[in-house]
């Protein structure tokens, strides 16, 4: 097992990767496992602006950030450097508030039947009936007909036959969207929301 870290950073003078057990320092068992220096990737004796390191072992489900040292661009002509710690801008998964990237094997996150899923193609884009919604707002109301366990969560989208106040008359959630003739749902937001502190659950 091994994990390869790569960063394209032509202005950097040094790049390191920091490995953590958790997505934030506030979680139980949080610890920094180590810091590893990335090397310049050369091609035909020329630097490609790419940095890389190959760490042996199983790093899956740990978290990481990059420490990137670069010339201080706030002062023109300055040769002083500054180091920034940042998550990976190409992260596939992140910890709390997106501050640390997660080392993840996407094959492990795919639900059963994922490879058999077939995208529904429309004859033309003008055939789409698009509906934008917020994941929590979609089903959070106690009268939505969605089970208490799934209200306001992704799993609410899997419930069929939901009706207002569970009275069996007015369809809600997915069934309501189907009645409207909606073909495409855009989820807003489903990633990191800067104004929301994800460490607070209420």
Protein language model features and the residues they cover:
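Glycan-association/targeting regions that enable binding to alpha-glucans and other polysaccharides
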Residues: 1-61, 73
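Short, acidic/polar
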Residues: 160-176
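Aromatic-lined carbohydrate-binding/catalytic grooves of carbohydrate-active enzymes
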Residues: 140-159, 180-202
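Short amphipathic alpha-helices and their capping/turn segments at secondary-structure boundaries
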Residues: 116-123, 171-181
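Conserved, mostly hydrophobic/aromatic
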Residues: 7, 66, 133, 177, ...
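The feature marks proteins involved in alpha-glucan
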Residues: 1, 45-152, 156
């Amino acid at each position: 097992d091994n994990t390869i870290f790569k960063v394209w950073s032509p202005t950097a003078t040094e790049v390191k990767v920091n490995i953590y057990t958790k997505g934030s320092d506030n979680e139980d068992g949080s610890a920094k496992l180590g810091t590893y220096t990335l090397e310049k990737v050369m091609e035909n004796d020329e630097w490609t602006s790419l940095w890389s390191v190959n760490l042996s072992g199983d790093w899956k489900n740990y978290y990481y950030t990059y420490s990137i040292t670069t010339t201080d661009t706030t002062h023109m002509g300055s040769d002083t450097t500054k180091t920034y710690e940042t998550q990976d801008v190409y992260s596939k998964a992140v910890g709390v508030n997106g501050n640390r990237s997660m080392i993840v094997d996407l094959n492990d996150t795919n639900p059963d039947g994922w490879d058999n899923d077939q995208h529904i193609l429309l004859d033309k884009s003008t055939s789409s009936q698009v509906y934008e919604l917020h994941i929590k707002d979609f089903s959070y109301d106690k009268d939505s007909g969605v089970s208490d366990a799934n209200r306001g969560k992704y799993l609410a989208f899997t419930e069929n036959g939901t009706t207002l106040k569970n009275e069996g008359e007015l369809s809600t959630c997915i069934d309501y969207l189907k009645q409207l003739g909606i073909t495409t749902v855009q989820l807003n937001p489903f990633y990191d929301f800067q104004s929301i502190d994800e460490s607070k659950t209420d």
